[in-house]
Amino acid sequence: MAPWSSLYRYVLPDTPGCPELVVDQNLRQAAIDFLRDSGAYVVNVPAFAYTADVSAYTHAPAADTQLSGVIEARVAGQTHSMQLGTPSIAYNARTALYPSVFIAGDDNINFTLWPTPTVSGTLAYRYSAYPTQTAATVPDIVVAQWADAIARGAKARILALPGKSYTNAKLASLYEQQFRATINRAKILRQRGALTAGTRVRFWPFGV
């Protein structure tokens, strides 16, 4: 994990006189917007054991991050259908014996395996995340891949602040356009599985 100061060199030269605290706040918000809207930060969670006759499990996202969405879940090595929420009688009757993983929660990732497993096995999953509003750090891989994009988002916000020595509405608008364009590019790369060399990231919407 990298501190926000690791991104200063992309921001401070273009925002002279801006306090570092303000830079931190706007870098954080830019990172939140970028990763939430693009899904570009994907965490692959190694398989963990589940036990027979126990259907509910809870995991916490990585430090300083919060869940954006679960992309894929594999139970006993097989990809399962994912649904948002919890199982219902109507769903159970409609899909008799079709295996599903139900996802719920914000601060934690709550899984419900349905039908309840009758034997022990493993569950592995991958999810997208973004920084919390109090995050003091950002994942290293995000800095390596998207430092310039996040910096442009931060500069757009900083330069749009009214009445400051560094206020520049025209440049702020340009940076905002570039920031949004890069979000769209990152979203496409994620859907194509091209974000990280050697790692395939498959887009799997809820309910499929």
Tell where the protein language model's regions lie, with residue ranges.
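Glycine-enriched, solvent-exposed interface loops adjoining structured elements
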Residues: 1-208
